[in-house]
Amino acid sequence: MEARAIAKYMRISPRKVRLVAENIKGKPVEEALNILKFTPKKGAEMLSKVLYSAVANAEQIPGVDVDSLCVDIVKVDEGPTWKRIQPRAMGRAYRIRKRTSHITVVVKEM
């Protein structure tokens, strides 16, 4: 059986989250949580919250052993971009793009 968790509109660039997401693909949940715990990135904290949620969703399925779960899919998609204006010299304005991410984590039994 598999369980999934999705976090939408997370205020971090998908490129930055993917750096961390590659480290936990295919790993057992306990090992993945340890990796995320000691990774000094903002994306690691966000991914660990989504992973905890996926494990909690798996607990709701009858007959699933939580200790035998492994990370099957970690998908980081681009969400909508917030556009802001940065005033510059001589009346110009630069555009600031504040990117968001949709993070999907799927766990399954080994």
Curated annotation (Swiss-Prot):
Pfam families: Ribosomal_L22. Keywords: Ribonucleoprotein, Ribosomal protein, RNA-binding, rRNA-binding. One of its GO terms (biological process) is translation. The keyword RNA-binding applies. CDD domains: Ribosomal_L22 (cd00336). One of its GO terms (molecular function) is structural constituent of ribosome. InterPro entries: Ribosomal_uL22, Ribosomal_uL22_bac/chlpt-type, Ribosomal_uL22_bac/org-type, Ribosomal_uL22_CS, Ribosomal_uL22_sf. GO terms for cellular component: cytosolic large ribosomal subunit. The keyword Ribosomal protein applies. Belongs to the universal ribosomal protein uL22 family. This protein binds specifically to 23S rRNA; its binding is stimulated by other ribosomal proteins, e.g. L4, L17, and L20. It is important during the early stages of 50S assembly. It makes multiple contacts with different domains of the 23S rRNA in the assembled 50S subunit and ribosome. The globular domain of the protein is located near the polypeptide exit tunnel on the outside of the subunit, while an extended beta-hairpin is found that lines the wall of the exit tunnel in the center of the 70S ribosome. This is Large ribosomal subunit protein uL22. The gene is rplV.
